[in-house]
């Protein structure tokens, strides 16, 4: 079974399932391992991890092989790379989406964070003893998106390794994206990255091209909700400043009225990104509703104050109760506006002081009346 690894700060889940769709369109039997769910070919379930621990991974791989899977696409987190959570798993190839500030509570510096991501390229390269030669098709493919943070740096650093490093950019797309229904320039990059790796994996160009038009938003990735609000309402997993800026900018392009952002920042995690998220929302949304997003052991009010420190005089509403915050945006937004509920996406719980209570942004939006 070929195992394909997708790493980067934002976009891993989307690239993973899109690549799986492309390989399936090419007649391959493909499972996947994502933050949201695992698909072994016979069942779908959640592990609670982006990249599960090795014993769980081995069980997943064994079940996939039993089901006749030819391929598995999996998300590879920086934590998993640093901890070698995947053991001696032999990857057939991989892709890098981008690198923006996140997980500095773990990696401490952006340099260490980048090196963890680069280490995945080193792991891919360790499976061959060949010398790095540009364009060598027999080397493990490593598709690198040049559009996002650290893309050029990753391309240059991986280029000295024995890998078939494939540059990908939406500025010079090799596929026609006119039929793509996934909104946002970042999704163009995500789809092109998956397409490049699919082609390197043996999927015919025309097959991948035809599959692009059949992709639909899913799993709280700019997923539109049917609600009683006068505005269009979307749920998205954006939980970094870069992701927040990207998704709000994408929505701006088709919104004639105001763009509303409902968001917070996780507790007991990288606190340095909080004012950056506030700044991103202040610069790309017309109105922000700042709320709680898994405060964990921290004081929600203090997290919100840190977010606000980056917002200047931007218009905002502060409501620590996430349900009330969502309802506030949905009730005040007008026809022609768009509301984007950010941060949790597919998640179905809110963690406060060690207790996880049921909470699904999508369900809360549907309950609004």
Task: Mark where each language-model region is.
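ATP-dependent carboxylate-amine ligase
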Residues: 136-137, 196-220, 224-369
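Short gly/ser/thr-rich secondary-structure transition/capping motifs
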Residues: 52-55, 74-80, 112, 167, ...
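Short glycine/serine/threonine-rich phosphate/pyrophosphate-binding segments
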Residues: 14-18, 76, 80-81, 189, ...
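Glycine/Thr-rich phosphate-binding loops of Rossmann-like dinucleotide-binding domains
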Residues: 82-84, 104-105, 152-154, 243, ...
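Acidic, Mg2+-coordinating active-site environments of NTP-dependent enzymes
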Residues: 67-70, 89-233, 308-312, 317
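A generic structural signal for residues located within well-ordered alpha-helices
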Residues: 14, 52, 116, 186-189, ...
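Hydrophobic anchor at the start of a short beta-strand
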Residues: 29-31, 71-72, 165, 259, ...
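Phosphate-binding loop of NTP-binding sites
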Residues: 1-143, 154, 159, 255
């Amino acid at each position: 079974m070929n195992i394909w690894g997708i790493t980067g700060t934002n976009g891993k889940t989307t690239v993973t399932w899109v690549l799986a769709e492309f390989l399936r369109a090419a007649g391959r039997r493909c499972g996947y391992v994502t933050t949201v769910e695992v698909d072994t070919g016979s069942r779908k379930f959640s592990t609670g991890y982006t990249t599960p621990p090795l014993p769980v991974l081995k069980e997943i791989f064994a079940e996939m092989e039993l089901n006749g899977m030819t391929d598995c696409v999996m998300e590879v987190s920086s934590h998993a790379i640093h901890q070698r959570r995947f053991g001696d798993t032999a990857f057939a190839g991989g892709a890098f989406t981008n690198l923006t500030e996140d997980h500095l509570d773990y990696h401490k510096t952006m340099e260490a964070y980048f090196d963890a991501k680069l280490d995945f390229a080193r792991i891919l390269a360790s499976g061959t003893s060949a010398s790095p030669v540009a364009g060598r098709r027999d080397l493990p493919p490593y598709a690198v998106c040049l559009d996002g943070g650290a893309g050029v740096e990753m391309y240059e650093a991986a280029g000295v390794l024995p890998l078939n490093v494939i540059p990908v950019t939406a500025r010079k797309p090799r596929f026609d994206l006119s039929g793509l229904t996934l909104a946002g320039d970042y999704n163009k990059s995500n789809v092109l990255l998956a397409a490049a790796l699919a082609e390197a994996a043996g999927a015919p160009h025309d097959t991948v091209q035809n599959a692009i038009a059949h992709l639909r938003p899913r799993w709280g990735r700019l997923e539109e909700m049917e609600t009683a609000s006068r505005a269009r309402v979307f749920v998205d997993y954006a939980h970094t400043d870069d992701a927040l800026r990207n998704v709000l900018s994408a929505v701006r392009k088709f919104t004639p009225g105001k763009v509303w952002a409902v968001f917070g920042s996780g507790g007991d995690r990288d606190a340095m990104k909080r004012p950056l998220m506030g700044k991103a929302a202040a610069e790309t949304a017309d109105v922000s509703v700042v709320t709680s997003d898994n405060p964990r052991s921290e004081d929600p009010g203090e997290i919100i104050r840190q977010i606000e420190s980056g917002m200047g005089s931007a218009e905002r509403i502060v409501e620590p109760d996430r349900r009330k915050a969502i309802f506030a945006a949905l009730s005040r937004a007008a026809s022609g506006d768009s509301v984007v509920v950010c941060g949790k996406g597919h998640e179905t719980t809110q963690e406060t002081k060690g207790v996880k209570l049921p909470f699904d942004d999508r369900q809360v939006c549907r309950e609004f009346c």
